[in-house]
């Protein structure tokens, strides 16, 4: 039977971000959104302020198709930008303020925003790099006081958000540049709406109080510039949850908000959780109702034990910038530490495979490893103005994660390694290649390998294995490397987190059969020398 012809007056409902706000404004109009200690507003207020922000941007010259950058902490202002900017047809460009100044400048020039909303804490950074801007950009300075409020208060609270093409770009951000310059990743309205529905289904379909539900009090502890705060602000808003935004991360303030606002659900990288657990007030704070999703780096067993002792329900999840990010989550109903730390089960609509180099699937035996490749309706379709990297990302019709893992008989995934030797420290990624290039330029260095060594607090820390030239003073080589890396940090070329913890001298660096550094053997040697376990 042929499909029915669409009626001329039928409404083809587009999947748009504005629809995520509709239900909460009706069913949760009086529900509260808290921003640090400075602001409390209802969902009805949020709806009005989103319209005022859109009008303020329009008065500033922003039109459909333009890009608006944001440099702010995790605040109600950022949440308002999550909606107002894409809803008016512009692109929300979340600028990663943790990149080095040189990388921030690169992303701004490459991403080409027409206007940037800048919190006063980041004005010095903008002042330092603006001479390198390759185009005129409107800068709107804001702060925790009157600046932002006066800006939007002067704007009307009525704005007719258009019915956009659901495939229109809604957001843009940049990867952390582990293999060269950061890459631009964008998402459409359709992708973000489907990701929101996937999050709600994937994290909500668990018995009892496990997971992410209508009764939770939500507080993000992942920067909102990082993959839309993992997408949870959109999901929390669609569900009409009580939301708490902590501003600049401070462990004392975070603990205070958890206690005062009865926060029950957060997500973060291991370093942030470690920071909270290390604070003296942690032992005086009741954390037994706090559910935390850990991602961005491997979950150290020691951190998992400390969290359990504090009464925190801790589970792992997995994704990446190019996947919006949700791909898998551990069994949220389990209290078994081994299960809680697993990479977990694919989310709804996620087609996940582990394959060989020629894209053949491997057995689901809990042992055979391969590269993790995925399909889902919310994956990025490529990198901004980078066709070669985009083709590589989607080689064979699946998105290549670059992660190595295996699938258990029950269908759950476990990540075991990275195809490329990126170093993950505190949720930040450091390029081993950049460190190697810097060190190899120093006096007396014959060859060098940068690897990540396990660290209970940071997940990994960089270590250099250095082969020096004959008749060279090791102490002088060490001094030169340290000074050169510190100089690169001082000028903003690399992050301070890239400074290696150790420099180890070796007689030779092992090679593979094709003459490349054998990082696996280097790592084994370094771990043995440092008496560490992988």
Where do the model's predicted regions map?
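Conserved AMP-binding/adenylate-forming
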Residues: 13, 37-39, 54-102, 429
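Conserved pre-ATP/AMP-binding loop-to-beta segment of ANL
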Residues: 29-31, 156-174, 180-181, 207-217
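Conserved AMP-binding A3 loop
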Residues: 42-44, 170-198
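AMP-binding/adenylate-forming catalytic core of the ANL superfamily
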Residues: 99, 105-106, 116-120, 266, ...
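ANL superfamily adenylate-forming
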Residues: 123-166, 193
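Conserved AMP-binding/adenylation subdomain of ANL enzymes
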Residues: 193-217, 225-264, 279
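Gly/Ser/Thr-rich phosphate-binding loop
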Residues: 238, 263-268, 277-338, 351, ...
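Conserved beta-loop-beta connector loops within the AMP-binding
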Residues: 351-373, 409-410, 472-478, 518
């Amino acid at each position: 039977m042929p499909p029915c012809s669409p009626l001329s007056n039928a409404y083809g409902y587009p999947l748009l971000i504005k629809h995520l706000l509709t239900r909460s404004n009706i069913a949760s109009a009086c529900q509260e959104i808290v921003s640090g200690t400075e602001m409390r507003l209802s969902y009805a207020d949020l709806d009005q302020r989103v319209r005022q922000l859109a009008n303020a941007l329009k008065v500033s010259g922003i039109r459909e198709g333009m890009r608006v950058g944001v440099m702010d902490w995790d605040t109600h202002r950022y949440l308002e930008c999550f909606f107002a900017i894409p809803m008016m047809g512009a692109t929300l460009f979340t600028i990663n303020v943790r990149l080095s100044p040189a990388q921030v400048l690169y992303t701004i020039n490459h991403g080409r925003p027409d206007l940037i909303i800048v919190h006063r804490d980041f004005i010095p950074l903008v002042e330092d790099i603006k001479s390198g801007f390759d185009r005129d950009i409107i800068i709107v300075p804001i702060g925790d006081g009157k600046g932002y409020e006066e800006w939007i208060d002067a704007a009307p609270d009525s704005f007719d958000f258009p019915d956009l093409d659901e495939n229109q770009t809604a957001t843009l951000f940049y990867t952390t540049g582990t293999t060269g310059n950061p890459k631009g990743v964008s998402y459409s309205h359709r992708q973000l709406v489907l990701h929101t529905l996937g999050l709600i289904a994937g994290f909500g379909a668990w018995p009892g109080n496990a997971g992410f539900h209508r009764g939770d009090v939500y507080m993000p502890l992942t920067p909102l510039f990082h993959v839309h705060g993992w997408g949870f602000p959109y999901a929390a808003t669609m569900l009409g949850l009580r939301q708490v935004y902590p501003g600049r991360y401070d462990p004392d303030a975070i603990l205070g908000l958890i206690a005062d606002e009865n926060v029950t659900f957060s997500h973060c990288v291991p370093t942030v959780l470690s920071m909270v657990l290390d604070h003296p007030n942690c032992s005086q704070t009741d954390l037994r109702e706090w559910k935390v999703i850990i991602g961005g780096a491997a979950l150290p067993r020691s951190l998992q034990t400390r969290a359990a002792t504090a009464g925190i329900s801790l589970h792992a999840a997995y994704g990446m910038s190019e996947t919006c990010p949700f791909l898998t989550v551990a069994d949220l109903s389990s209290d078994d530490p081994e299960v809680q730390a697993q990479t977990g089960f694919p989310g709804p609509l996620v087609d996940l495979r582990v394959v060989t180099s020629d894209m053949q699937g491997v057995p689901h035996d809990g042992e055979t490893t391969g590269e993790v490749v995925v399909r889902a309706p919310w994956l990025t379709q490529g990198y901004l103005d980078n066709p070669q990297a985009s083709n590589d990302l989607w080689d064979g019709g699946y998105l290549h994660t670059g992660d190595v893992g295996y699938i258990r008989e029950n269908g759950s995934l476990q990540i075991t390694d990275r195809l490329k030797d990126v170093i993950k420290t505190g949720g930040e990624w450091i390029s081993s290649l950049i460190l190697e290039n810097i060190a190899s330029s120093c006096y007396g260095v014959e060859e060098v390998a940068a690897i990540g060594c396990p660290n209970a607090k940071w997940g990994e820390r960089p270590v250099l294995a250095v082969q020096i030239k004959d008749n060279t003073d090791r102490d002088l080589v060490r001094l030169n490397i340290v000074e050169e890396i510190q100089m690169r940090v001082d000028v903003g070329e690399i992050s301070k987190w890239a400074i290696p913890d150790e420099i180890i001298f070796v007689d030779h660096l092992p090679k593979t059969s094709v003459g490349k550094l054998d990082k696996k053997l280097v790592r084994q040697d370094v771990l043995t020398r440092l008496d560490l376990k992988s």
